[in-house]
């Protein structure tokens, strides 16, 4: 079996990141969120947003590639993990590897704690990797408030 390669995202990845993000949310979040919530969440997701995050948004985006295809991506700024999304057809450990790379990047940039707002379906994954629940909150996506859990991990 081929191994994943972790690398920084580049603007040319924006289309793949957008497609992967939508596929992951639609496949993995249904059950934790309604179909209407999911569509509101994804309503404004366009490749330009990912390019902006990489070039002007101050975020570091990392991708996990398998056989030259983006299988997962993570976005981090300072001590905040903004997202980690895995292609449901290509998982096989990509999330775990990408989370470790994001933690390393946060440490390298001086963070002592990594924070995130976990989707309800992702809480078990983050708990398994040492994150602790802090509080329940909401994020606004497409005009809807979506429930999330604030979580932290000491690095």
Predicted regions and their residues:
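Conserved GNAT-fold acetyl-CoA-binding loop/helix
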Residues: 22-49
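A short helix-loop-beta-strand connector motif used in the catalytic cores of GNAT acetyltransferases and
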Residues: 45-62, 80
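A conserved beta-strand-loop-helix scaffold within acyl/acetyltransferase catalytic domains
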Residues: 74-79
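A short, internal acetyl-CoA/4′-phosphopantetheine-binding micro-motif in the GNAT/acyltransferase core
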Residues: 84-91
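Conserved acetyl-CoA-binding loop-helix of GNAT-fold acetyltransferases
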Residues: 91-104
């Amino acid at each position: 079996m081929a191994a994943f390669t972790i690398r920084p995202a580049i603007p040319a990845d924006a289309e793949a990141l957008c497609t992967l993000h939508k596929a992951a949310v639609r496949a993995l979040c249904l059950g934790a969120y309604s179909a209407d919530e999911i569509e509101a969440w994804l309503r404004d997701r366009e490749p330009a947003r990912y390019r902006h995050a990489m070039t002007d948004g101050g975020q570091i985006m990392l991708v996990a590639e398998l056989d030259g295809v983006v299988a997962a991506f993570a976005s981090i700024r300072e001590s905040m993990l903004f997202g980690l999304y895995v292609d449901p057809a290509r998982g096989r450990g990509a999330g775990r590897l990408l989370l470790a790379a994001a933690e390393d990047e946060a440490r390298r940039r001086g963070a002592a704690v990594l924070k995130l707002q976990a989707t309800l379906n992702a809480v078990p994954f983050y708990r398994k990797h040492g994150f602790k629940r802090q509080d329940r909150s909401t994020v606004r996506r497409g005009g809807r408030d979506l429930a999330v859990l604030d979580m932290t991990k000491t690095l």
